[in-house]
Amino acid sequence: MAAIQGIYAREILDSRGIPTIECTLWMDNGGIVVTSVPSGTSVGKYEALELRDKDPNHMNGKGVLTAVNNINTIIAPQLIGRDPANQEEIDNLMISLDGTPEKSRLGANAILGVSQAVLKAAALSANQPLYFYIQQRYQLVPDLYMPTCIFTIANGGEHGANNLDIQEFQVVPASHIDFLESLNIGVFMFHQFEEVLISKGAIHSTGIVGGFTPNLYSNSDLFEILVETVKTSPYTFAQDIFFGVDIAASTLMENGKYRLKDRSEPYSSEELLEYYRKLRDFYHVFYIEDPYEEDDLKAWQNISAELGETTKIVGDSLLVTNLEKTRKAIENKTCNTLLVKPNQTGTVTETIEVIKLARSAGWQIVMSHRSGETNDDFIADLAVGTGADYTKFGPPNRGERVAKYNRLLQIYTEMQQRQGETTKEKVRGMSHDLPGANDPSAKSAPTTEPPLAAEPTAAQPPPTPVAESAPPATTTPDVQ
């Protein structure tokens, strides 16, 4: 067995220029792994606590030196000599060291950094790619398949400096389409969307995750431009390409109602359901994330009952990758799809348990980035290894997003090489896919052996850990 020889954390910057944590772990066999922790902008009220220094003289009060120090002086000494293969034991030890329900003492960002590093170290010691190790270790799915990518094209709300309310406007290739071709669809739609905006003279830029942020009169205008973009492509709308949205509805609630630019009066929960029904019917929006504020539970139940047969009703702020909240959502039938963000719960073990529970209920899984990302591609391996049905890594733009897509592409290539043939890896699919697209027998032979992985190489470990101090209008249907 390998043993942890040292762990060292430091403060780095995420894609927004806001501090986050990087964690390096080295073992007695010479293997070294490095990982980093993302951070969100629109944060669910029930997420595990991300520890910030709140020192106005350092990084505008958003520093993470306290969390870094917690790793270097509290967590690391407890893990020296332990086998990284004992993930649950190590995660539970860190949870015990913290001793709070929301991980507020050590910080969920500190605990997750170490938890991810431990998983990477175990895979390296086993001489296996991370995704293969995860699949073999946890057996959440019997075989390895590529997920379907959800591509963010445009942003509004807290992710965009414009007058659009919806946080993410997404393009989703149908799951009968090969991964490589689906990546081509995402890239085509992203760049062609910009060309259509330019042709209309729309003023636009990109937001904090890299999606376009045009100034338009309404959310419906944006959908119309997306439809026009699809028409310029070789693909068929509602057969090859569908739309999705992240509403982030908690950011839209005012005095018990929801305000959208599509009409002057705010929407009641019942009226908003009709709005979503029209989005599905007019624009083939089959994926709706956080359609209501997380405590508007009756509205969640209603939309799941009314639209759940044809639409992914996705819980992000509702579930916050939390086991008990997911269990309650299953019992109360408030949604049918789990969005996974490991930093919402704080450990690999807890993340795996939530995925396992959602799977047992017949839900589908979406592995998601955060707005404040790093170049770490950990979640790409986690998505494939846990059999996620979808990934949501943002637009095919900006290095921290592209790193995840490139890792998926690398995994896809490795899987092809192991099978010795050109494959069409498909995810367990969408209810409106072509006949046969969701039949597991239609999939190519699963990968049963790990792709070749590099042998662990000896390297000079980091220094002995030392504690750090603390717009134009378009003609649109009446979607109101």
Question: For each predicted feature, which ranges?
Answer:
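Short, Gly/Pro- and small/polar-rich lid/capping loops
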Residues: 1-21
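Mobile "lid/hinge" segments at catalytic clefts and subdomain interfaces of large enzymes
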Residues: 46, 139-140, 144-210
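Metal- or metallocofactor-binding catalytic centers and their adjacent structured scaffolds
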Residues: 38-128, 137, 182-183, 211
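Catalytic core of soluble alpha/beta enzymes
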Residues: 220-438
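Conserved phosphate/anionic-ligand binding catalytic regions in large, soluble enzymes, centered on
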Residues: 13, 20-23, 102-125, 148-164, ...
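Structural signal for hydrophobic packing residues in well-ordered secondary-structure cores
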Residues: 27-29, 71-72, 76-83, 94, ...
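Long, low-complexity, intrinsically disordered segments
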Residues: 449-480
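Short beta-strand elements
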Residues: 21-29, 35-39, 151-173, 228-230, ...
